[in-house]
Amino acid sequence: PYLDARYQIHGLSSPFAKLPSLDLYRELKPLKGLLKLSRMNQPSMESFLGITERNYCDGGACIRLYKQFASGKKPEAAEIVMGHNQEDLLGLGKIFSMLSYLALFNEDYEALNCEIQDDQLAFTIKTNYDLPVEFSNHSEEFYIIGQNNRVRLLVKLQNGRLKQYYSNYKDYDYIPSEDTAIPKTLSACMDKKLRRPAKRDNCYTWFPVTEAFLHDPLKQKTYLKHCLPYYLSVLK
């Protein structure tokens, strides 16, 4: 977009007009909480990837140098500005590898194993892409760690049961006395005092973790399809 705008300002036709484009930072935005990124910018992402060495100045200093170069006051600044831009481009190439983490959001994985460990259910899944850097994160009822193409998920059990979350929470009512959600089409006949509109964090039902579930990767994948988006969304 920036180069297209510069071509337009100078009355030139842009060679990029017919090329497909990708807003990399927008694509990676869902990863902010999962990977504990302080900001969705290039320095934060490079820091996550372990890229710490740069030979040229940062963006703020580079802008000041560019203005001095453009005004003719400091022609030697061109080398520094070009060097900074080169490092930015090389860094972007490495940041592209972070797209592999989106496999968790796009259901681009397969369930390999599922077992009960104390009061938790442990899932092991295989992503279709290698993850560039090991990561881990957790919430009150969920823990996740990933390395290479393996991700391990630990979900809290309650009396041998799991919560099954639903993303279309506006179509559900939450029943406090039952600690469960039911479709509004069914709750409409209930006393209004017994129900309230469901929210994202209480739109769930419960199901028992059976031996059949523990040995059925398809059922495990179905569960993760419904619930993993919620668990990922609450990470910070």
Give short role names for the model-derived ranges.
Residues 1-236:
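DEDD superfamily 3′-5′ metal-dependent exonuclease/proofreading module
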